[in-house]
Amino acid sequence: VRGPSGSGKTTLVEIISGISGYQKGEITWFNKTLNARQRRWLCGLVFQFPERYFLGLSVAQELRLGHKRLTTEEQISALTKVGLINLDLKKPPESLSGGQQRRLAIAVQLLRSPKVLLLDEPTAGLDWSVRNGIIELLAKLKDKQTILIVTHEPELFKNLNTDNYELHNGQLIPE
């Protein structure tokens, strides 16, 4: 989904994920209407600015949320998939760069393994090598999960897309 700044792209993924409400309509998954709680279980959301949503814990604790039996090896595997090799698990996420924080947020969602992965500007502000790594990772995930990306740079994801939309005046318009 692409659209100009202020068009509601972030609001769209927040509504789909169940963290924001909506005025009318319904959200369905395989013909079943879902409430906000059901959508929160179904979806994983990676924000454009994930630093706002970390809980002040260590990297390891953020990864382990909801996964009490998660091993260090599983944490390292998820971090490696997003290009965060040799990251100190004891560090707070707030000490990481913006790009590292975004990749950590993606790693958290990889461990959750939601059926729907929602990404708000997943490559914004990342250097090219990291961008390419994230795009390659998403290409591997697209066969296992539904992925919805909102972006100002749809051309970066052209090889992943099966459906493209523009958000214009609150309407999703197929391209």
What are these regions (language model features)?
Residues 17:
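Helix-to-loop junction immediately C-terminal to a conserved catalytic motif
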Residues 21-39:
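Conserved ABC transporter NBD signature motif
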Residues 127:
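ABC-family nucleotide-binding domains
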Residues 92-96, 100:
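Conserved ABC ATPase signature
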Residues 145-151:
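Conserved H-loop
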Residues 72-88:
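Conserved ABC ATPase "signature" region
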